[in-house]
Amino acid sequence: MSLEALLNKEEKGSGAAREAFMRRMNERFNSVCHKDAREQQYQDWKYLSYQEFELVNEWSAASRELTVNQCGQLLSNVKSAQAEWLAYEEFVAGRARLVAEVEAKREREQEEQEERQPARAKTKERARARGTAKRAVGRKATKAPAAPAEQEGGVPAARAAAKAPVRAEGAAEPPLKRELSGAKLEDEGEGEDDDEEEDEDDEDDEDEDEDEDEEEEEEEELEELEDIQLLDDDNDKDFSPEGGRSKSSIKLNTKLDINSDIALIQRELLKMAQKHKSAKAKKRKFTSCVVQRYDSDHTRLEVKVTLKQLHIKRLKRLLNEAKRKRAAEEALAANEQQGNLAKRRKTAQKQKPAANGAPAASSSEDVTVTEAATPVPAKVNGEAPSNESPVAAIPDINPTTGLPTYGMKMTAKEARAIQRHYDTTYITVWKDMARKDSAKLSRLVQQIQSIRSANFKKTSSLVAREARKWQSRNFRQVKDFQTRARRGVREMSSFWKKNEREERELKKRAEREAIEQAKKEEEERESKRQARKLNFLLTQTELYSHFIGSKIKTNELEGNMADSNLATAPDVSAIDLSKPPTRKNEVHTIDFDNEDDEELHRKAAQNASNALKETREKAKAFDGMSGDDEELNFQNPTSLGEITIEQPKILACTLKEYQLKGLNWLANLYDQGINGILADEMGLGKTVQSISVLAHLAERYNIWGPFIVVTPASTLHNWVNEIQKFVPDFKILPYWGNGNDRKILRRFWDRKHLRYSKDAPFHVMITSYQMIVSDAAYLQKMKWQYMILDEAQAIKSSQSSRWKNLLSFHCRNRLLLTGTPIQNSMQELWALLHFIMPSLFDSHDEFNDWFSKDIESHAQSNTQLNQQQLRRLHMILKPFMLRRIKKNVQSELGDKIEIDVMCDLTHRQAKLYQVLKSQVSASYDAIENAASNSSGDDSGNMSLSDSKIMNTVMEFRKVCNHPDLFERADVSSPFSFTSFGQTGSIMREGDVIDVQYSSKNPVSFHLPRLIYDDLILPNYNHDSDMRTKILNHMMSIFAPANSPDLCATLSKVAGVEPNSILRLSQEHIVKRAIDLSAHSPNVTRSGIFSVVYEDDKSSLSSLDKTLLINDKSDYLHTIARTTQNGVLASLLNIQGNFYENEYMNVLRPAYRPAAAAPPISIHVMGSSNFSIKRDNALFEPYITRSLGIIPPELQTRLTEKENNIFTALPISELYPAPLNKSFSSYISMPSMDRFITESAKLKKLDELLVRLKAGEHRVLIYFQMTRMMDLIEEYLTYRQYKHIRLDGSSKLEDRRDLVHDWQTKSDIFIFLLSTRAGGLGINLTSADTVIFYDSDWNPTIDSQAMDRAHRLGQTKQVTVYRLLIKGTIEERMRDRAKQKEHVQQVVMEGKTKENNVQTITANGKTLENLPLPL
């Protein structure tokens, strides 16, 4: 069952299969989800690794300027960060417990703060009141006279007053102590608030340059960090959950945790990601936190705080602690100083009343000073000494005098004496120290200062030197570090890309394997089902074929090819065809998985009988239909019985035995109402067999039409001629021409109540496929009795408009005529079968699965072919197709010989081919595949890319045919450096006018006359130096012999009169010839030209050997001796001298100048002698006239004066033959010899035509390109081969005349044809040689072209030559064509081996032994 039916629950009993399928799909989906989760974890880990890499770079950059201690500090910071991270992980593990503890601790702190606030307020009020009272007492003490005591006491008294007595344990704390304690408590109670205020002050100091918006964003960031509840070290207040910043109730109530709504968490995370949009804030804060991962299994949100922010907060904390410590010390010192002042004021106040109220005591000097209390211990290093050591730090002070008593009882006088003695001793010691040690210490201090400054200078220079070294080293380190960092980034990027690519490939491979496995399983199930369906449909078709074959006896015509399996099949004779057709078993309603073979066979037999009954009923219905009343009611061919058909009498020819059998087969098909395909090999008379069946219907059953014949345009006239020739009684309507002509012709069938009898306006209408498409609306209105489609491969595409229009015609029977039912693929055979039996062959996909794939793969790769399947295919095709081949039915027609002539590219062709190949080197394999896989269809369904490839293939084929298809050689000539003169009006002149040489060189040279007269002429004509004259003129072969002075000098030696020699030297050459001809009796007419060429040793002197004029009486003798060997001799030996004259006796210039010019014009000023002599030497009027035709006036004058009768001087080209070939002008015409040798095919064709012409063969040459035909016509004209041409541009009437001329005129040597235009339906049996200059995509087109000569009426051996270029596109095309031909042979003839085609390499030696037609 299909996947769609399985999922939609359309099949019954498929629950288990559906559950298994869904279970497999769920497992695959779970595996895909698991892979996706692993991929997400991998991406998170890669992101963390990249962050760590950035942090390492930041640390490395920051550590460049660190010292050893700072590096240690950084290392300790890293360790503390690691400890914090471990603590954070521990916090993540026990988060719920820690959060509960933090909340409880926070609540307790809030309660304690609320309890301490009233006490703190009271303490502040008391301290404020005490401060007010102290200030009041101090003002009073200042007003009292305490100066004597201060003067007496001096510095020691002040120092003693600064020391306060210390109470014993258990005693009440003095007021000063209580005040200090209160201050300390106050400080301790407000410590956290002070820290918070100091932190806020620090932040304000740092952000005083920032905007208010950035400060608000920072505060929001800190609040959000506190909301997320980040925990760090327990001692780190900045990161502890109980941070100093107070939380509002709203914050606590709206705080998010991991159990909050996912939408709120996402919104908060989005807020955190969108913070600090300004670049300045981002640079300062770096980042607040990064959400690493949300673990849905443990419901936790992992957050990471960057180390840079951690260091900033730790530094702030250290600074705040230092500030608090300094403030506490300053407050303590201030409190102690304030307390000492308060004690002194109290002591002074007590002593003053005692002196006023107790005079007895003041008068007595025996007042003792007792020890009042233990002195207060001093702090050492900030720690108070223990109570166990009551040692006094200072001596006791007498409260009355304020002098020290040193623990003894003494009077005030004694105390003052001791004080004076102490002061004297103290001053003496200081004086001695100042006198003795001050100078020494001063020198020592100066020396130490100088040494220190020197050391400072040395240290600074060393430091500067080391700093410079470090700076240079640091630059190199930075550069190396950057290089290493870039390399590391590249390597890391390439590594991860490689891993990602490998993982993607693995993932895709796994998915592809899973899909392939599922597809394979589905294909196995579908193949089993299709096998049963195939067996059902084949059985149905074979039974149908059996029913029809029993009626039309196809086995008797083609031989017994029945399938042996039908003998063991159930008895089909039991099926009664007379019963009405039962319900048809539709294929899609049959369950091929559950039905057994017997039931399937029964249903197939039922379907076959139904199809046959429907076909017969359609034929009966057509015969029973009438356009109006009883029209065509006389047609009832099915009532005739089975009889043996004889040749119709109205057929004006004698059918051969196999043609008569074909007539019987066609008649039986008509009786059964079945359409057929007459697929006899080309040349066996398909046309006459189809005409004979029309004649049979007209003669036997009085059915005279209407018949329609559809044929290609090239065979329209041939059909008209054949029908008129074989059945003269038929009236033919040729339906083609322009629109007006066709409109007139349609009147023949637009009449109502028209009966088609012998007297009907027409019986057979002949038209083309183009007319069918254009006038389909008119032709479909007619009810055609019989339709004949000639060359039915024209409807090989079921998608074409031809096929659709013809299928919609109302026809009783259809007959397809084709010699090649299969041209490119099995699809074309299916299109023809579907056209004749649409109900039986309705699915091309099934037909392709059954037969096409197996047969086409066998042809391409030579795989094993299923013979049983091939026999079943033949059994199916047998009722509808009749095919005979020539060698089986006609023994007098021999096999044709096919020869592939392989040529090598010429140098120019190879260069062009390589250039084209280099331009498409990337897709050259695709182009070759296109060349080998192209079917050559004309459907026009190729895509844009396919059309581009085919255009490129066509360019390669042009190179193989001839390079001139790209660019023709042109006439070349040098630059003409000249100026042309202009003549006056010639209206006043006679019939002949002498025109001087008008071209002149633009460069002219003016020669002074003095130089010409005195230097040139005397030296040339003077005979003073006889020796020089003789040596340089007489004895030199290059000296002129017409010097009058020299002749007069030598006349005495020669024995001739000087006047005679002078007269001869000054006469013109024509005059001398006339005189010689008229007055010399020794010269005969036949010896005139022997005098010119000096071949005859006559009695004439050397002076008489000049140019003579021929006479009409001796014209033939003159022509005989005009050329070297004689014209007549050359005409009698043309073949022998052809190669010598054309190839060996031709001289061509090796160099052609780039520019040409006449000689430079020389003018002698004041003299015309030089100009006259020059013009007479170069442009003698008599000589120039002698080179052309002599005017009648001159002939008359010469005849009257000299009695010389002549017509004209001979044509110049006859003097002599090699001259016109040995010398040529600078104007170069394209060489035909080079034109021939630059194409390998044309070169071999030239050699082959010479041999074929010698053997009196007649040749058909087929082309694919009309431009190539133009080039070949030039070649044939050059070789003077008589030829005619037919291509697609030829008109219909011209085609008929060309074919008639070829068949009747034997002097035509070559017939040039286009393969598409001249390869269908025409008879060219006068030719015995076929040459394919370039092959068609479709091998069937070439086969049809061959059969124009190899067909009935051919009495000679037919030889086919195919010119191919080795190692190119053409060779690939030829291999593909052989595969297509093999498919045709397998299907139509049952052959499994290819035809034997000879392949010959066309080098010089092998082509000589090339077999020629007999």
From Swiss-Prot:
Domain Helicase C-terminal span(s) in chain numbering: 1244-1398
Domain of life: Eukaryota
Binding residues for ATP: 681-687
Domain Helicase ATP-binding: residue ranges: 667-839
Complex formation: Component of the INO80 chromatin-remodeling complex.
Principal place of residence: nucleus
GO biological process, one term: CENP-A containing chromatin assembly
Task performed by this protein: ATPase component of the INO80 complex which remodels chromatin by shifting nucleosomes and is involved in DNA repair.
Tagged with keyword Protein transport: no
Basic and acidic residues composition-biased segments: 106-128, 175-186
Molecular function per GO: ATP binding; ATP hydrolysis activity; ATP-dependent chromatin remodeler activity; DNA binding; histone binding
Short motif (DEAQ box): ranges: 790-793
InterPro entries registered for this protein in UniProt: DBINO, DEXQc_INO80, Helicase_ATP-bd, Helicase_C-like, INO80/SWR1_helicase, P-loop_NTPase, SNF2-like_sf, SNF2/RAD54-like_C
Annotated localization: Nucleus
Bias (Low complexity): 154-173, 350-361
Protein's recorded name: Chromatin-remodeling ATPase INO80
One GO CC term on file: Ino80 complex
Record's comment describing the protein's domains: The DBINO region is involved in binding to DNA.
Organism: Eremothecium gossypii (strain ATCC 10895 / CBS 109.51 / FGSC 9923 / NRRL Y-1056) (Yeast)
Reactions it catalyzes: ATP + H2O = ADP + phosphate + H(+)
Similarity section: Belongs to the SNF2/RAD54 helicase family.
Ranges of biased composition (kind: Basic residues): 129-142
Compositional bias ranges of the Acidic residues kind: 187-236
Alphabetical UniProt keywords: Activator, ATP-binding, Coiled coil, DNA damage, DNA repair, DNA-binding, Hydrolase, Nucleotide-binding, Nucleus, Transcription, Transcription regulation
This enzyme's EC code(s): 3.6.4.-
Coiled coil start-end: 265-341
